[in-house]
Amino acid sequence: LFAKMLRSPHPHARIKSIDLTQALKRPGVVAAMTGKDLPIPFGILPVSQDEESLCVDKVRMIGDPVAAVAAIDEETAESALEDIVVEYELLPSVLTIEDGLKSLEETEISKTQIHEYADSGNIHKQVALEFGDIETGFAEADHIREELYYYEGNTHLPIEQHSAVAQHGADGRITLWSSTQTPHYVHRALAKVLEMPASQIRVIATPVGGGFGGKTDPFQHEMVVCKLAMMTGRPVKLTLTREEVFYTHRGRHPVLMWVKAGMKSDGSITALHFRNFLDGGAYGSYGVASTYYTGALQTVTYPIANYKFEAMRVFTNKAPCGPKRGHGTPQPRFALEVLLDKFAEDLELDPAELRLRHLIPDNSKTVNHLTVTTNGLGECIHKVTEASRFQQRRTGSSLGKGFGLGCGSYLSGAGLPVYWNKMPHSGVQIKIDRGGGVTVFCGSTDIGQGSNS
């Protein structure tokens, strides 16, 4: 069977009623369901169990699914969606970071609050960490700059859409084949949502193709196909359309950034202070981790003795954001690199030279306790500037625009100093048999990087 999901045309609304009667009468339709058939919420992180397989009482974004059907073919399933009658009560929408930051007093919170479990109003997560003495660092600076930056979000856009097939066996076990980067998380979510022992569920991660972080959450369509397979006793497949992939999203957060930095006349950074405001969209996803990542990894390229970052992630009535290549770091890195260029102008230094003078050395520990074993950024800058004739082209342009230098970085194995907690962050089990065979059990799903080999 083939499944399709009916999605909300409204960004924020209460669901007053859903009528499946006519859809079930359509020839070729085998089953239909609403959120009341799978009311238990789920999520990728324990602190953000805020997603429903199908929305139960409220939709929080355009594209939120409210009902699903299974039919003999995709065309019949698609047509049956038109037979479903949904009555909504529209609610005010929160569409910007600024609106998400408004206090309880400034809004009719009973109507605009997207999730009741939020820290305050529509603030999902707040973070504040300081390393060193930020005020002392600014006092030591010869130059201080204070800037405001905004990074537009973007999406992963893998060629291969999300797809899942579920089968309910005669023994009562569920098998799910899904284009997922995180089968263990999907397995855990299914056990919770279906109220089944995990031992009765098997999740098989099929060759994913493109993922880029966009297939690292457990998703609604995976829960829905499993329930429909249980309802019908037949295998059920659901493939998202390209439009639905955009609704699913989990792309890079839009971030509003205030940054203040102090620098000595030789170009060394004495203090760096970030305030980041993330537009998280309608659901938690990896948002708590994303909030930490927008601040924690800005110290691994240049030595910074005093560092402070504060961050807030707000809920808005838009597609949920999550992890995308370089999770959480391109946004503040963009701000920092532009800021360094402005400092280079102040000091009348070449932008490349400013960076080369102050690279974090190998085998060092950053102010926020990240360990940098090797840093090849200097060699990279040399090669790029030479191959591109950076100095000649930058100074030779009559407009002085359209040609610049920016550096990015990411650190592997940085879980603990980014998100401080007592939970285990990774593990591996190795088994060696008597014949010399070695079996490795690890939590890394192979999506092309070679984990299986």
Regions found by a protein language model. Give the residues of each.
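Flexible, low-hydrophobicity surface segments
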Residues: 1-120, 144-147, 415
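Alpha-helical support elements that line or immediately flank enzyme active sites
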Residues: 5-33, 67-88, 163-208, 212-232, ...
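Beta-strand segments within the central parallel beta-sheet cores of soluble alpha/beta enzyme folds
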Residues: 34-35, 200-206, 233-243, 270-275, ...
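Acidic, glycine-rich active-site loops and adjacent beta-strand->loop/helix elements
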Residues: 38, 180-183, 207-211, 240-250, ...
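Short acidic, glycine/serine/threonine-rich loops at helix termini
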Residues: 42-47, 80-83, 178-179, 187-189, ...
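Glycine-rich and small/hydrophobic secondary-structure elements
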Residues: 48-77, 213-265, 322-346, 367-390, ...
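Helix-loop-helix junctions that connect adjacent transmembrane helices in secondary transporters/permeases
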Residues: 107-194, 359-437
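Glycine-rich loop/linker segments at domain edges
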Residues: 120-164, 254-338, 417-425
